[in-house]
Structures are given as C-alpha cells and as structure tokens.
C-alpha cells in the first residue's frame, strides 16, 4: 500500500502582531518577486538584443535562397509534379509544396460596404449578432431572478492585502 503524503499544516494567526508581521513578509516577498521578474525581463531584453542582429542576418541569407528555389521549382513545375499529378516535389534534402489557399474576403471601409449592402438589399451578406444584455438584467434583478439559467451575484467581496511601501523620490 502506498504511503500517503502528509499535507503541510495550515498557517493560523492568533494575534495582531502575527498578522502585522505576516503583512510585512507579504510586502517583502512581493517586492522580491517584482525585483526578480524585472531582472528576468532585463535578461530577456538583453538576450533578444544580442541575438536580433544574428537572426536578421540569417533571415537575409535565407531569403535569396528561398527565392531561387521557388524560381527553379516554378520553372520546372511540370517535371517536378508529374504534370500536376502531385502538389509536392521531393528532393534528397527536403521537399517543396504548392498549396492552394482557401478563398478569403478582405473589406476596406467596412461602414461604406455595410451601407451599400443594406441599400442594395443584400441582407444575406450581413450578420446580425444577438447577445444577452447583462446590464438590463442587472437593472431589473427581480425579473431576472425568475429566468432559468440567469443568476444575479450580489454582495461578493474581495479581500485585498496591501503592504505599505515608501515611494522613492
């Protein structure tokens, strides 16, 4: 039979002094957390700054190679795809693929397009979204309580601990 791992005893305070000490410790730990997060972000920034030129140089080296491979493959597409029987051409070191993107719609000037569609009677191209008005439900809580699936939450309280900190000036 497996042995049960004992859980850590629950921390309890019985005096104001203990609570004050705990709030001070929360502040100290929070500041240390912030300091470490800042240090981590500084190192991430320095690392990114260090590698950015190298990555850019590699990308600039890759781009002409990609263009040349694409030009060759486009020029020899029939031979590589067995006259369109396949969409992939295999080479010893890798493969190239031709993939048709699905159709998409790009809209510039959405308001003008919307007005035109409405004016021309193209309502089938307009989507009307319905959603529940939560503000109206909150304004009429007595009516809302009688609706199945609707719950009005009231009197919820958050407990916030704010250790005092001196602002550096």
UniProtKB/Swiss-Prot annotation:
A GO biological process held by the record: DNA protection
Family annotation (Pfam families): Phage_Mu_Gam (PF07352)
Signal peptide: none
Organism: Haemophilus influenzae (strain ATCC 51907 / DSM 11121 / KW20 / Rd)
Function per UniProt: Protects linear double-stranded DNA of Mu genome from exonuclease degradation.
Organism superkingdom: Bacteria
Entry protein name: Mu-like prophage FluMu host-nuclease inhibitor protein gam
Keywords: DNA-binding
Entry's Gene Ontology molecular function annotations: double-stranded DNA binding
Family per record: To phage Mu protein gam.
Stored InterPro entries: Host-nuc_inhib_Gam
SUPFAM superfamilies (UniProt xref): Gam-like
